[in-house]
Amino acid sequence: MDVKDGASGTLNDFIVDIKALGPKNGKNQDQQLFGIEVTGGSIVLGGDKLKVDLETDFIGGGNNQATAIDFSTSGSTAISAKQVDLTVASKAQNGKSVYGIAKSGNGTLKITSDVVNVNLSSATVRPANSEVNNDYSEIIGVDISGGSLITAENTALNIKVHSLATAATVDSLGGSSNKAGTSPVTGIKLEGGQGAFNGTVTVDVNAVGGSASAVEVTNYFYNTTLGQNYNDSAATVNKLQATASSKTGAASGILASYTKGSEVNSVILKVIGEADVTAETESGTAKAIAVTGQTTVEFDGNVTATAAASESAGTAYSIYTDAGTLSLQGANNTLNGDVSIKNASTLSLGNGSHVSQTALNGNLTADSGTTIELQNAVIDVAAGKTVNVATLTGSDAGIVLNQLDEGTLTVSDNKVKGLAVVASASANDLYADASEAAEALSKSIAVTNSSASGSYTISGQSGALSDGWTADEKGNITSRTTNQSLDVFGNYNAMTLVQWRNEVNHISQRLGDVRDSSATIGAWARVYGYDSSYDDNVSIDFKANSIQAGGDYRINNTWLVGGAFSYTDGEGKFTNGSADSDGYSLAAYLSGFFDCGAYVDFVGRIGRFSTDITAYSDASEFKGSYNNTTFGLSAEVGYHWKLNDTFYVEPQAELAYGFVKGDDFTGANDVRVEQDDFQTLVGRLGARIGASFADGAGTVYAHASVNHDFLGDADYTASLGSVSRDLSVDIGGTWVSYGIGAQFNTSKNLNFYGTLERANGSEYQEDYRYSVGMSYRF
């Protein structure tokens, strides 16, 4: 269909299906093949669908072409069909150039379709001595050489451009010329004019021997009709996914190039949203983002740039600049492949408004005369990769090294004030001590500060095993931050010891006051718990609730013997994680009450505690489970001294030993933990002062004790690979406990009792501890 001057209106649901076949032999076939050609007028291609399907085996070079839609008008045209499918296939080995959408002239093309699919292919393998006149050819999905092309925000533009050639000629190996070998392929090419792709753009192109470019912006083109042309070119893309591959030729995900002419032109590309750009080759050169000449390319969103060469003869660059300007301003960028900055180029990372993180999975080389600018930006250098920069500028900048070999970082002229050079968590974990890591980092870098403004600091990130630290330029440690996840584990380790220590209970808490009972058999049950905290580098809040039931038998007027079973459920919370634990224990006790008022209480205990813990650090998640078997013995003595028929004083002393058998386990971050056996030996001196109700109805009292743990060390070893650390937490020391209690005897055989208390001392605190029980004497 041909639309000329004066034409206007809307054409809905237009379908073109053309198969043009010609003689198999011949020097040239000048026929041009267009699905839709708009040379004038103003039309709208609308409806639900627009479909153009062209297939030809015509031969020809130069301007001979097969084009789905050609717009060369100076007017305004539009495509509004909901779905657009454009397919063009050239199957001749001396085939024509192939285009999906060709936009020239000074007019404007607006596309508001939901989906635009462009599929192009060519079988051209043209020898250098081709008999075809003006024998160049190319394949371009969307070609803009003048005017403007604008897509709507809802438009998804999908472009696939493929070479059907089975092999490349010798003339085309590694070359980018379109006059021999397989046709070069391009997804989107701006060689003049403006493109505003406000929706999403997905491009997939591949060539055999020719070059392949997913998106290309340039100021120059040549054809046999117009000759050499130099133009301003500018494009914006909202969201881009681009893949370019060539078997033996050059592959560029994004190519911005400049050819010097009689006038100065501008070449600008801006990607607003996220961009995922890939370039692949077997033996050619792959450049994910290539910026050459007086060109400017800017990415406002996150960028992933990947370049790969599958053979040793190939080379790959995630970024390649030669006299151009490239800016990556996204918060998270990933560069898979080497970075090469040449000939007065500038690479800028970040824009100062937010922290920009760039993962560099390749070597970065910035030659003399070039500049790397970091504005509130950090480069994270992969292990085994190096950075060699001539001039570094910016502010709030950092470089993180994941391997500390000599020569990893070289900056010839650092103009950044306070450049942070950091050993990553994984690199820091390779050293048993912070001083060793600091020394290795200082030897791995060679940073020369500008006399005017440059300076740098070195530090290490806290890893799965290592502490964080800072050091001077010579590697001398100036400050240290303990490993938060290991610190939490160590302190919670100690809380396990506290939990078992707290299972020691005074006789009045367990049984109430049974001194005056003459019943032979007793049964009792109680619930108890506490809310505690431990603050040493990290803060832990621990709550536990238990239920205990037991029974006893009075041997004679003095002695009774009994046993008990208890279950405990505990929960720990801390700023960087949480833990859950539960435990079971069995206890046997022997209690004696003497006529003089004295009493003794002996308890033996055995238990089992299980713990699940999760702790987070900047580097990793420490997650593990472990089990501890526990043993305990305690002895309490006291004297019940009646002041009169109502009031009494009861001094008390107690010694309790606890043993927690250590466990070994491996956390989710591969840190191996080997616990030592923990021990506690608590001495307690205290008293209670109370008043008894008339007729044996019960008692109320207040009590206070001074407690001291003579042991209380929780030691363990943490290891990662061949590196290990011996760590320890001391939960011993002195604390004071105090509270109130009461017992109510509702009958001769049934009584209820309870206590409420607090504890304070050193890093360990108890906001409250409660115990409520009942007993029945038969």
Cite the ranges covered by each PLM segment.
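Residue-level detector of buried hydrophobic side-chain packing
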Residues: 254, 339, 413-415, 525, ...
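Membrane translocator/pore-forming domains, dominated by Gram-negative outer-membrane beta-barrels
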Residues: 520, 526-778
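C-terminal low-complexity, acidic/polar tails when present
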Residues: 143, 158-160, 212, 218, ...
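Outer-membrane translocation/initiation segment of Type V secreted surface proteins
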Residues: 383, 395-550
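Primarily extracellular Gram-negative trimeric autotransporter adhesin
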Residues: 24, 163, 177-183, 221-225, ...
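Parallel beta-helix/beta-solenoid
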Residues: 11-14, 42-47, 51, 82, ...
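Extracellular beta-strand/beta-solenoid scaffold signature
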Residues: 1-4, 15-40, 51-76, 85-108, ...
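Extracellular beta-strand/loop-rich repeat segments of large surface/secreted proteins
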Residues: 334-436
